[in-house]
């Protein structure tokens, strides 16, 4: 297990360095009420008093009220300012406009909300001189479980090297509210959605594999496939050069 006292100090120093080098006046991040947002919010607030978490409902059918409550509970405990921007009408308008141009797929529709949230965070960041903090962890990044140019877009990410297992350990060390530690991880993209059901592997299996542990051949095959088909999300943009 990591020394989370040391990890806390190093990551807070990292965030302060990012702000100092960029000349930013503050930080903004998406507060979904999940574990990653909770940890990022706590770290950012410790590094910068002017930290804002934004809750962005976007016609999500999953229990938004519970997620919003969990996000506020973390924010209240650690003194993080919370704002709400309802993107539901924006998404509905976008879908209506798209109907005239293409026949959408469930996956394409699911990725609209994360990209609208990214746009919202960068609008706030641009208007107020903030930097956008990313909330993706190492487990999600390895299998590409994030939306390209959506929740994967940010100016800095203080938890990108932590697996889901380590995120939970870190939150327990910080005495974060149990509500974000005990519920099943979910991107809340559709009714009943959970990360593990959608991926077909548990985070325990994924984290063990990333750490070099042994897992069943079928789970290894699934993880390898997810990593392979999502490689385009992790590499720089292909740019033409002579």
Annotate each predicted stretch with a short phrase.
Residues 90-98, 112, 180, 209, ...:
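Generic structural signal of hydrophobic/aromatic residues within well-ordered alpha-helices
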Residues 76, 109-117, 131-202:
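Catalytic subdomain that performs nucleotidyl-dependent activation
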């Amino acid at each position: 297990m990591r020394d989370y006292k040391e990890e806390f100090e190093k990551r807070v120093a990292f965030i302060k360095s990012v702000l100092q080098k960029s000349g930013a006046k503050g930080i903004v991040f998406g507060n979904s009420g999940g574990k990653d947002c909770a940890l990022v919010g706590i770290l950012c607030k410790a590094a910068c008093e002017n930290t804002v978490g934004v809750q962005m409902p976007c016609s999500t059918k999953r229990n938004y009220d519970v997620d919003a409550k969990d996000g506020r509970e973390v924010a209240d405990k650690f003194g993080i300012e919370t704002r709400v921007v309802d993107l539901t009408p924006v998404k509905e308008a976008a879908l209506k406009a798209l109907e005239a141009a293409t026949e959408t797929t469930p996956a394409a529709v699911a990725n609209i909300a994360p990209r609208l949230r990214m746009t919202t965070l960068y609008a706030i960041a641009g208007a107020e001189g903030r930097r956008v903090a990313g909330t993706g962890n190492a487990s999600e990044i390895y299998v590409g479980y994030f939306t390209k140019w959506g929740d994967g877009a940010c100016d800095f990410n203080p938890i990108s090297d932590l697996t889901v297992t380590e995120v939970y350990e870190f939150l327990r060390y910080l005495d974060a509210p149990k509500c974000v530690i005990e519920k099943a991880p979910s991107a809340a993209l559709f009714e009943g959605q959970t990360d593990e059901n959608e991926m077909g592997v548990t985070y325990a299996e994924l984290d063990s594999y990333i750490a070099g542990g042994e897992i069943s051949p079928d789970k290894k095959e699934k993880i390898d496939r997810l990593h392979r088909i999502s490689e385009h999300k992790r590499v720089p943009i292909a740019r033409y050069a002579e």
